[in-house]
Amino acid sequence: MCYIEITKDNIEDNHICCALSTKQYEHAVNEKKRWLKARMDEGLVFYRLHERAKVFIEYLPANEAWVPINAPNFMYINCLWVSGRYKNNGHAKRLLDKCIADAKACGMDGIIHIAGKKKLPYLSDKHFFEHMGFTLQDEAAPYFQLMALTWNGLADSPAFKSQVKSDSINEKGITIYYTAQCPFAVGMINDLRELTEKKGVQFQSIQLSSKEEAQKSPAIWTTFSVFFDGRFVTHEIMSINKFEKLLNTLA
């Protein structure tokens, strides 16, 4: 199988796997491309299958990652995604092997990734990572698990930052934290705002626009996290209909 690396030089001529057949999110895809190009200056690497498919890995040094974690000298996997008919063909392992090789070449102590305690949309299946030798390093409510593959036994253990342990914020109504990392998050935010305000519920969205903001965030899943009356509700980027059902149970 042929994989290609997406770089600043070729990104405008290549798809980035996200929202492949959704024309309405084209502006959000372009925003993610701009985000990726900026992160590439900070060490982000993006490999994908050389097909029109959602098969890719995206990783960068953990100290540059847009997540509230402490993991000096580790590589952080933003996303490892293999979908549809491409599952169960060894793609995830081969893409992970590229990350491992890069991390070792950089003299790092290991690799980390956030997975779900159970199978959940947009979160990796922890069982694959356990099979690949990853072990649990830290947990945060309600279902986030920080997994690590470590080859330096003297390395400090990766951990979530303390501010995410409370699982709450001091805000009323719906509050959504998000970044440009996922086109679906950027593409949906205005529709979610319109629906929420129509129902008479207070709404605010906070787009994290820097590494520093993301690392200080109260949301573990900075790509997209929904809070209601200060309590974390979900990381799932929902359709309008599904989000309306959620609102009906909350408000």
From Swiss-Prot:
Gene3D superfamilies cross-referenced by the UniProt entry: 3.40.630.30
Any GO MF annotation of the entry: acyltransferase activity, transferring groups other than amino-acyl groups
Transmembrane stretches, start-end: none
Classification lineage: Bacteria, Bacillati, Bacillota, Bacilli, Bacillales
Keywords: Acyltransferase, Transferase
Record domain N-acetyltransferase: where: 4-152
InterPro entries xrefs: Acyl_CoA_acyltransferase (IPR016181), GNAT_dom (IPR000182), Thioredoxin-like_sf (IPR036249), YoaP-like_dom (IPR025685)
Matching SUPFAM superfamilies: Acyl-CoA N-acyltransferases (Nat) (SSF55729), Thioredoxin-like (SSF52833)
Family: Belongs to the acetyltransferase family.
The keyword Acyltransferase belongs to this UniProt entry's keyword annotation: yes
Protein name in the entry: Uncharacterized N-acetyltransferase YoaP
This enzyme's EC code(s): 2.3.1.-
Keyword Acyltransferase on entry: yes
Cleavable signal peptide: none
